[in-house]
From Swiss-Prot:
Domain of life: Eukaryota
Comp. bias regions, Basic residues: 1-12
Subunit structure: Interacts with alpha- and beta-tubulin. Interacts with BBS2, BBS4, BBS5, MKKS, TCP1, CCT2, CCT3, CCT4, CCT5 and CCT7.
UniProt-recorded name of the protein: Deleted in lung and esophageal cancer protein 1
UniProt keywords, alphabetically: Cytoplasm, Differentiation, Spermatogenesis, Tumor suppressor
Tissue specificity as recorded in UniProt: Expressed in all tissues examined. Expression is highest in prostate and testis.
Cellular component GO terms held in the UniProt record: cilium; cytoplasm; cytosol
Molecular function as annotated in GO: alpha-tubulin binding; beta-tubulin binding; tubulin binding
Biased composition (Low complexity): 30-39
Disulfide bond entries: none
Signal peptide bounds: none
Function according to Swiss-Prot or TrEMBL: Essential for spermatogenesis and male fertility. May play an important role in sperm head and tail formation. May act as a tumor suppressor by inhibiting cell proliferation.
Claim: Cytoplasm is one of the keywords in the record: yes
Amino acid sequence: METRSSKTRRSLASRTNECQGTMWAPTSPPAGSSSPSQPTWKSSLYSSLAYSEAFHYSFAARPRRLTQLALAQRPEPQLLRLRPSSLRTQDISHLLTGVFRNLYSAEVIGDEVSASLIKARGSENERHEEFVDQLQQIRELYKQRLDEFEMLERHITQAQARAIAENERVMSQAGVQDLESLVRLPPVKSVSRWCIDSELLRKHHLISPEDYYTDTVPFHSAPKGISLPGCSKLTFSCEKRSVQKKELNKKLEDSCRKKLAEFEDELDHTVDSLTWNLTPKAKERTREPLKKASQPRNKNWMNHLRVPQRELDRLLLARMESRNHFLKNPRFFPPNTRYGGKSLVFPPKKPAPIGEFQSTEPEQSCADTPVFLAKPPIGFFTDYEIGPVYEMVIALQNTTTTSRYLRVLPPSTPYFALGLGMFPGKGGMVAPGMTCQYIVQFFPDCLGDFDDFILVETQSAHTLLIPLQARRPPPVLTLSPVLDCGYCLIGGVKMTRFICKNVGFSVGRFCIMPKTSWPPLSFKAIATVGFVEQPPFGILPSVFELAPGHAILVEVLFSPKSLGKAEQTFIIMCDNCQIKELVTIGIGQLIALDLIYISGEKSQPDPGELTDLTAQHFIRFEPENLRSTARKQLIIRNATHVELAFYWQIMKPNLQPLMPGETFSMDSIKCYPDKETAFSIMPRKGVLSPHTDHEFILSFSPHELRDFHSVLQMVLEEVPEPVSSEAESLGHSSYSVDDVIVLEIEVKGSVEPFQVLLEPYALIIPGENYIGINVKKAFKMWNNSKSPIRYLWGKISDCHIIEVEPGTGVIEPSEVGDFELNFTGGVPGPTSQDLLCEIEDSPSPVVLHIEAVFKGPALIINVSALQFGLLRLGQKATNSIQIRNVSQLPATWRMKESPVSLQERPEDVSPFDIEPSSGQLHSLGECRVDITLEALHCQHLETVLELEVENGAWSYLPVYAEVQKPHVYLQSSQVEVRNLYLGVPTKTTITLINGTLLPTQFHWGKLLGHQAEFCMVTVSPKHGLLGPSEECQLKLELTAHTQEELTHLALPCHVSGMKKPLVLGISGKPQGLQVAITISKESSDCSTEQWPGHPKELRLDFGSAVPLRTRVTRQLILTNRSPIRTRFSLKFEYFGSPQNSLSKKTSLPNMPPALLKTVRMQEHLAKREQLDFMESMLSHGKGAAFFPHFSQGMLGPYQQLCIDITGCANMWGEYWDNLICTVGDLLPEVIPVHMAAVGCPISSLRTTSYTIDQAQKEPAMRFGTQVSGGDTVTRTLRLNNSSPCDIRLDWETYVPEDKEDRLVELLVFYGPPFPLRDQAGNELVCPDTPEGGCLLWSPGPSSSSEFSHETDSSVEGSSSASNRVAQKLISVILQAHEGVPSGHLYCISPKQVVVPAGGSSTIYISFTPMVLSPEILHKVECTGYALGFMSLDSKVEREIPGKRHRLQDFAVGPLKLDLHSYVRPAQLSVELDYGGSMEFQCQASDLIPEQPCSGVLSELVTTHHLKLTNTTEIPHYFRLMVSRPFSVSQDGASQDHRAPGPGQKQECEEETASADKQLVLQAQENMLVNVSFSLSLELLSYQKLPADQTLPGVDIQQSASGEREMVFTQNLLLEYTNQTTQVVPLRAVVAVPELQLSTSWVDFGTCFVSQQRVREVYLMNLSGCRSYWTMLMGQQEPAKAAVAFRVSPNSGLLEARSANAPPTSIALQVFFTARSSELYESTMVVEGVLGEKSCTLRLRGQGSYDERYMLPHQP
């Protein structure tokens, strides 16, 4: 159906154009390939498996998958059609079927079916024939209607074309040629109604032009000639120079015809499937009429024959032809010949009519008639993915009436494949109208476009070309090819976002990479998740996927490093192998700001004026007043194209005087904010727009009266720091931003106060004015300021009324204001007032000073003061005064005493009587006033009388009077005499005072009281005269002769004029002798004070832990608290020392005097003197001694005497004594003395080496460093006993142990812990004796708990034989845990030793080194200690009751000896000379000599050197042992002593016995040992052993690259004489060859007999070792004498593989020659001489006598 085909083509063309309009810009694929070969990502595949009848005819046929091998069979007829799945289809058959079920069937008989039924008619079935007749009629009617439809459509199209041509012609005639482009002429009247056949339209029931044109057809006269307007006519010159448009059009038409003819010729010689899709009529329109060679040009002869003759001739010709006419087989004729068959596509040509008129339609060339027609004409694949295989069926239909053969050539590219054809019959022949089908397979490896073709060769001369195309709608991105990032500061980062949207019809994945990386070696290496960088640009994301209609933001980071434009090119690649360039551009800029304008006059600093060191600009404001504001306009230009965020900060200036040419240092620049500045700038912060001028207002608003000086700094926020080229080259660049000061403006401004001047500045009202009268005064105020002032006058209305008019207002600059002062006096007298005028915004007001004098009534008194003199008590006195009015105003007055004076006395009633007390005086009048005073109290009267005048000035009259009586008194009536001692006179002072102004006599009487006889009192002076208000000091001396308290003593004093005498009481307590005995608190634990009569506990304690042979001094203080002189004496009862201890002087050594004066000798002599002093003190042999430095003397009055008392001991124990102190007649004082001495009197040091005042620690016994398991080392130690007692030592050795779970030890003993033993160590039992014998053990109560079955008896007084302490049978001791007893490491002998008093004994300490484990490589510290528990065998030495007590055994601190040593393993220092380890690197190919023909070496020895060094101080004895394949030698002799191993025990014993040589290495010496490794073929054979049979120390390792190594590990043993060993690891790595074939089998396929075929196989060496290989041929099947397979070469040498290089290889040529038509199989094995793993190659080949398997160009 032509109409249907045309519609299909139109829809296809429109869709194809739409896809091409929106396709992503592709790039040309690489030369030599028809499709991209780069790997791409998978894209979504939209394909359908549904097929319909239109599959064979539709251009856009859907492909199918490989799993569907055949076309779906036609389903059974259905009543209803299903709705199509595609939303774009226009098929409405399902709707018609549902509505018109009876008229519209589901199945339609197509063109091919109906044509086949009509051609195949002739059936014997009448019904079928009737059906075919009806079908033929229907088809003819259908074609007739289609022809009519096409005729109507063609007629309408031609009519429209003619109307358009006529319109254009008319418009071109009416248009003006030179104004053609400027003037738009109106359209002409349409002529389409005259070009169309209205009757034809009405016949087919269509709308005609008469249906919508209502006007009648006008009558037109004959056409006139064309008349052009004058403006359109050409001038003479223009006509000469111009070319006629008709000529141009003619030339253009001629050229177009030539090109069209050439194009049609090309089309005539090109035959493909696209050409035959066109209808025959359409093609006939494009072709020129063909001329037949058989027809003569002169046809007039046909008109000369008569009709009967012509019919007769034709009849004869028909008879002649019927004899030779027979049906020929058109198969054997070419399809383009006469008998080659007719075309089923093109109708047969019509015979030309006879006559002058012939058909002008073009005829179809028989040579161009197609034989086969492809359906579809183009193999088109869409919506494919990577991986699946797609199929489509191409049907080739025979379009001729003859059965034809064909041959199809497959596609040339690997992406398309052609399956075997499916023919309708056997033999590969296609009947007329029948089709053969070929399955085309599509294997896409990417999502790009693919093009190929299939060639169909037939008997025709032209080949049918079927294009194969794969097109996937590409994604289309809206991303611009140029990404402009704009401007950015150098060192900064600017991010620009671009919207990237996929407006295509498929999903796409995209990858962005630098252009320099294109093409990449691997997409995985460049497909990063983050930014893709190409400095100074970075793009994110670098990999993204976009679905259709989706968008993503592409972020471009621009970080310029240099100034100017930066441009980089990126490649964005799609997964359909299409790429596109993206150009990123940006411009890097630096900050550039300019201050281009400052309003006002230009400011310059004055000469010598200090300015800011860093400011670029200077602005000075004119002096301004307070609270005023001055402004300046600043214009700052941002010269960059980048927005700059800024803010202003106001800082204090950096002022520093500089000499000419001197520069400042940056250290002197300080930045302090100016918080009290008067400057401000607006805006304070904001953003500077790119390349724009910005206006700022600088304001100066002073708020204080001073000069302001500040610096305005413009700070740009977050300005990036440019990276230097050095830092960028070193890779230290980092993005950092900071605020930068880019502009500094120094501003200055001064402030001046408001210049306000009052004229006059003070108003002085002359004369005196009476009160109540208003006084007016005028004045002026000038404003000399630079700004207007606003004033406000104050008011005064408290006493006077003062006002100014006007009170408020404004005075302009340099103007004056007139004011008037109103002053009304309210109080008489002069007044001075300051009237304030407040000036707005002025810190201080303007003051108008006013002075005036007002007066009222004035009264005066004739006297200045009133004196009454001295009065006696009860006396009255009267005085008179005169009051006179001196003013012209009447005055009302009143006089009284001042209330203030009454309150001061205090009195309620005034003693004055005033007559008259009040009255009124007329002007200039006078009156008398009498004032009377009555003396009622003794007092000194000073008061004031007030004269009150109404509205006038008051007057004051002072009054004086003195009223007294006689009075004398003592300052203190009781005297207590302190510090009164028996018989000692004591003086004190008393005071006698005269309380009046009258002179008075006094005298003292006798002492009164019942104790007056025991006392004597003397007063000096005894009598005298006291003047007015006199104080007299008297001396009183009292002597008491009794110690009773004085309480009843009185001394009288008689005074003239007083009725009773004065009495002085005397008291006091006489005291006796008082001496205080104290012990210094600083040196005694218990310090108390003893007072006579108040007994308290007093104790002299020298301490509870006094070290032996250490002086301890305490101070006894005697204080005489009375003025009585007395004697004293000190004495110890038992442990006293001789008094001549201090008198003994140490003899000086015999040496020069100069040497004796040195500091060292002086210290030595001082120590020796102290030792001699202690030896003298302890000479009595009691173990302890106490010595007072002053034993007796005189104690003066109030004297404090400090007496040093020294205590020391040379034997441990607790000592008690009494110190008897006797003072004068006081009772002797007994002071208990206590001292506990601790320490050990036994030491290994000499006595002279003891230190003073501190304990001496025993030096540690060091045994040095010993070898593990060595011999015992013994040290001798001499112990000295400095005590006066024999001391027994029982030794125990311990090892320290620090365990958190063991803190204390509980020791239980039965009997004494350390009994006496004989020399053999047996315990001795002997009776208790006080002096010597068996020891009675008594541990201290502080460290042990004792349990006994007997009751302890108390010991009182001295020791006696009857009071024996019962022996304790069981003792329990609890002590801190420090160590565990150990006797195997350290040992002391003898275990029990007695050191005599003042003598010495010798002990022996031995150390046995322990045996260390082999894991210990370093020396081990062995610490221990020995405790010598001290015991006293003499009971007297142990205890004297009440005097001393000495503990023993565990109760006393033992003698501790620290023992220290080191044990180190027998180990030598090993130094290796090969890479720091004893490792042998060998290759198995080392056994192959340079000439392989000479054979393979049996053994190869490699030697390394080992240096053994003895770094200790002791010699080492050792042997060297090692197993094969390693060996050792020293001094040329080989030693391969083997350690026992599997199968080598006997050999090891033999070699050890034969070479049992012990080596010795002295201290600090070294030895060189040779260690060898033997490589042999025997070792290489181990690699073939199974894994379970691999020998110990042998390991086979193979890397991922195929390299194979044998690793041998052994230990070199150094066996020392102490049965310890030292291990030196040995390792040998042998690289063995690893061969591999490139393939494991070779199949030659089917070959012609006796024809040799060759295949190449590569033999590769994967290891770093050479390989000598040979090829062995296996058994051949079938086994015949003639060998079918052979290899060349069959042996050779493969070099080692280099590091990081591909394996070395050699090409092996495998030859196969078939001897018969049989199947040949064989096996070849590649063997190596070094034990390599063999490689097997299986060979296979088939012989055949078929010549089609014969290779050309071979015999």
